[in-house]
């Protein structure tokens, strides 16, 4: 209040008349004591569900555009043939995922869309579509730290965010914080000069990058839906001119109307179709010990010197633990695996047991079964 009063100190308003003449007050002081001043005893919230309470001030101001009947085929073609590379199953999921985020902006996304593609392929254009719909409640984050570290007051009124050229793989702390941001219904709001405050989170997230390894994806990953964006329109300025005319014109309003009417009553966003990009992210996210196991399984060779293939030596179903430890040690040196990520003999034995269901003796299964595992 004091800062606001200082700002308006030179702005006066007539509040009455005395014998000596008109009386004046500072704008803020006059407003504070006015009988028609609106008072919100319930405080300030951000709730896109549209709750109306005269005692609560809701920071959600609604969508940025109004729906309009008509065709949105330009935008739909972009989503199907560029974002989803023509895959109908992926396209159906993305449409319902977008419809959910638009129809239920009050709900946390729970699944982040991950788009990997070459520069100029159109990855960021999806963000422009959502920016037109959500307006000030949309954010483009050009620094991953804006999402996972430091002050984050900018996220309080955000329902849809795009993390541009963001890579979250390889940093356990950052990866863990990101997963929490995607699924947690609350977040700790940190503002400079204020205590940390727990507030509801409404965030739905898209991550875009041209890096090979973007996210740490586990074998049973359910927080990400990764897609490789098609490069078919790179350099086609006419295509993107037409697309942006649609986004900045009335067609986006037609798309908004379609999304608001889209049937998602039976849509489970946590059940996603398989994608090649998910398998790629999972392979790149394997722990070094699992990467080593994949390497020897694919090579059919468990010998310590990984680079000297001996074609005449058959796959051995029985190998000594010493040989396996030696083989893994060579792999760690060749790949420059950090000490933190290395496993000892006992941990390696436990990993083999968990993969191949063997106890006491660490026998490898036949080559085909090992590759399958």
Annotate each predicted stretch with a short phrase.
Residues 1-67, 73, 103:
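Intein modules and their embedded homing endonuclease domains
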Residues 46-162, 174, 225, 229, ...:
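P-loop NTPase catalytic core of nucleic-acid-dependent motor ATPases
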Residues 150-156, 190-208:
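AAA+/SF3 P-loop NTPase mechanochemical coupling elements
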Residues 159-182, 214-221:
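Conserved AAA+/SF3 P-loop NTPase catalytic/coupling segment centered on the Walker-B
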Residues 175-197:
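Conserved catalytic/switch belt of AAA+ P-loop NTPases
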Residues 199-202, 217-286, 290-291:
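Phosphate-sensing "switch" segment of ASCE/P-loop ATPases
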Residues 286-318, 326:
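Positively charged, polyanion-binding regions of nucleic-acid-associated proteins
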């Amino acid at each position: 209040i004091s800062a606001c009063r200082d700002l308006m100190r030179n702005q006066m308003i007539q509040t009455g008349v005395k014998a000596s003449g008109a009386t004046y007050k500072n704008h803020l002081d006059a407003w504070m004591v006015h009988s028609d001043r609106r008072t919100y005893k319930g405080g300030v919230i951000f709730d896109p569900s549209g709750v109306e309470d005269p005692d609560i001030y809701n920071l959600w101001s609604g969508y940025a555009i109004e729906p309009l009947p008509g065709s949105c085929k330009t935008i739909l073609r972009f989503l199907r043939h560029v974002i989803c590379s023509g895959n109908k199953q992926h396209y159906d999921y993305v449409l319902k995922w977008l419809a959910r985020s638009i129809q239920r902006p009050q709900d946390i996304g729970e699944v982040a869309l991950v788009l990997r593609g070459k520069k100029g392929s159109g990855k960021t254009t999806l963000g422009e579509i959502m920016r037109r719909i959500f307006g000030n409640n949309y954010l483009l984050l050009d620094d991953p730290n804006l999402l996972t570290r430091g002050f984050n007051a900018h996220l309080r009124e955000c329902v849809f965010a795009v993390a541009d050229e963001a890579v979250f793989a390889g940093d356990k702390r950052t990866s863990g914080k990101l997963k929490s941001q995607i699924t947690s219904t609350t977040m700790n709001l940190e503002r400079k000069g204020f205590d940390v405050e727990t507030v509801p989170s409404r965030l739905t997230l898209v991550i875009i990058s041209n890096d090979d390894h973007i996210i740490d994806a586990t074998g049973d990953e359910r927080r990400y839906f990764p897609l490789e964006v098609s490069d078919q329109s790179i350099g086609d300025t006419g295509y993107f001119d037409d697309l942006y005319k649609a986004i900045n014109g009335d067609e986006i309003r037609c798309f908004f109307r379609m999304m608001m009417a889209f049937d998602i009553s039976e849509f489970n966003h946590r059940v996603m179709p398989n994608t090649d990009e998910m398998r790629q992210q999972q392979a790149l996210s394997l722990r070094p010990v699992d990467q080593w196991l994949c390497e020897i399984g694919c090579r059919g060779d468990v010998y310590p010197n990984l680079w000297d293939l001996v074609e005449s030596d058959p796959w051995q179903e029985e190998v000594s633990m010493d040989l396996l430890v030696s083989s893994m040690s060579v792999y760690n040196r060749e790949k420059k695996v950090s000490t933190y990520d290395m496993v000892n003999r006992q941990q390696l034995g436990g990993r083999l047991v968990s993969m191949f269901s063997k106890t006491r003796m660490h026998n490898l299964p036949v080559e085909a079964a090992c590759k399958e595992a």
